[in-house]
C-alpha cells in the first residue's frame, strides 16, 4: 500500500555533524541547550542528535532519502497534532535546512519504545487499548489539510483505494501461487482475495495515517510500562485506518480495536474495510517477508474466523 523504498541518492555523502554545529542549529530556533548527549542512527532514514536528554535534532540522511519519507511531512503532521494535547507526540520547535541537510528540531519523547522492553498480559492490553484511543483521535482530525498537501501520497477516493487493494492482492496471490508451500490455509489465496473485495462497502473513510505505529514507535514508561505516545510521522500517507494496525499478533490488533472503539463504535462498513486491509497486509507480508511467515499465517487463520 506504500510507495516503494527506492533510495534516490544512495551514494550521497552522509556526514555526522559535530557538536558545535548541532548546538548552533538548535539554538537558531530559540532552544537553550548545552551538549549533545546521544546520537541515534537506529531509524535508518534519519540521524537523531539528543541534546541535554530533552531535545532532538532529527536530520535526513542523504543516502537514505526515499520518496515515501519526508521530514517536511513529519513537521506538517506534528503541527496539525499540536492542537490536540491528548495525543502525545513530540513538539516541533523548528524545521529548516542546514546546507543540503533537511532537519527538524523537536522535544524528545519521554519513555522507551515497546520493542525494547517486555510488555505482556494485562499491561500489554492496556498499552494497546490506549494506543487505539490515540489512533482514533489521530484519524478523526479534520482531513482537508492532509488532502490538500502534496506531501501525502495515498488513496483519496474509494475507487483509488479499491484499485490499490485489488492490485496488491493480485500481486500477493501471484507470488504465493508461485510458491504454494507458503500457503497452509483451507481457503485458496484467490478465493480469500475475492471474498475480501466483495465485502468492501460503497463508502470507505480514508484518512492520514501514521504508517507504522507499532512497537518501535509506540513509547511507554520504563518503570510502569504505561503508554506515553507516538513518534516518527515521516512515512505518513492517506488510506484506510486499518493499515495503521501494525502489531505482531491478531490478539494485539483486537486489543487495539477495542481501544479504538472505546468512545464511539465503528460502523459495519469500517469493519469490512478493516478486515480487508488486514488480509491485504498479511497476504503481502506472507509473500514478501519470509522471516515473519509463521506469525503471519497465524494472524490469517484468526482473521478467517471473523469473515462471514
Feature locations, PLM:
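Phosphate/pyrophosphate-binding loops and the adjoining catalytic core of nucleotide-dependent enzymes
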Residues: 1-20, 25, 78
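ATP/Mg2+ or Mg2+-diphosphate-binding catalytic cores
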Residues: 2-13, 170-171, 175-177, 258, ...
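An alpha-helical support segment within catalytic cores of ATP-dependent transferases
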Residues: 14-34, 110, 124-129, 137-210, ...
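Short glycine/proline-enriched coil/turn segments at helix->beta-strand junctions
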Residues: 31-32, 51-55, 86, 249-254, ...
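ATP-binding pocket architecture of kinase catalytic cores
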Residues: 35-156
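Conserved catalytic motifs of the protein kinase core domain
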Residues: 52, 101, 204-206, 226
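Active-site Asp-x-Gly
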Residues: 206-209, 214-272
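Hydrophobic alpha-helical segments that form the core
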Residues: 273-284
Amino acid at each position: 500500500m506504500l510507495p516503494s523504498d527506492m533510495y534516490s541518492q544512495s551514494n550521497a555523502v552522509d556526514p555526522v555533524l559535530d557538536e558545535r554545529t548541532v548546538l548552533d542549529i538548535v539554538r537558531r530556533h530559540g532552544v537553550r541547550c548545552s551538549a549533545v548527549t546521544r546520537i541515534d542512527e537506529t531509524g535508518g532514514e534519519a540521524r537523531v542528535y539528543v541534546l541535554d536528554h530533552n531535545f532532538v535534532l532529527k536530520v535526513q540522511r542523504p543516502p537514505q532519502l526515499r520518496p515515501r519519507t519526508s521530514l517536511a511531512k513529519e513537521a506538517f503532521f506534528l503541527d496539525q497534532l499540536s492542537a490536540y494535547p491528548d495525543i502525545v507526540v513530540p513538539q516541533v520547535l523548528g524545521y529548516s535546512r542546514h546546507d543540503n541537510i533537511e532537519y527538524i528540531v523537536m522535544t524528545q519523547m519521554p519513555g522507551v519504545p515497546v520493542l525494547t522492553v517486555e510488555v505482556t498480559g494485562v499491561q500489554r492490553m492496556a498499552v494497546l487499548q490506549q494506543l487505539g484511543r490515540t489512533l482514533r483521535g489521530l484519524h478523526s482530525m479534520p482531513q482537508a489539510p492532509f488532502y490538500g498537501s502534496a506531501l501525502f501520497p495515498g488513496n483519496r477516493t474509494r475507487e483509488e483505494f479499491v484499485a490499490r487493494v485489488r492490485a496488491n492482492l493480485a500481486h500477493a496471490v501471484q507470488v504465493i501461487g508461485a510458491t504454494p508451500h507458503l500457503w497452509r490455509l483451507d481457503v485458496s489465496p484467490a478465493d480469500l482475495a475475492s471474498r475480501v473485495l466483495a465485502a468492501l462497502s460503497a463508502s470507505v473513510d480514508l484518512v492520514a495515517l501514521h504508517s507504522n505505529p507499532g512497537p518501535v514507535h509506540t513509547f511507554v514508561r520504563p518503570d510502569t510500562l504505561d503508554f506515553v505516545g507516538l513518534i516518527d510521522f515521516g512515512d505518513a500517507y492517506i488510506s484506510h485506518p486499518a493499515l495503521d494496525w501494525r502489531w505482531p499478533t491478531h490478539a494485539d490488533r483486537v486489543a487495539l480495536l477495542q481501544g479504538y472503539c472505546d468512545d464511539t463504535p465503528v460502523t459495519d462498513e469500517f469493519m469490512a474495510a478493516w478486515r480487508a486491509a488486514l488480509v491485504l497486509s498479511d497476504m503481502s507480508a506472507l509473500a514478501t517477508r519470509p522471516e515473519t511467515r509463521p506469525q503471519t499465517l497465524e494472524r490469517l487463520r484468526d482473521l478467517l474466523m471473523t469473515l462471514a
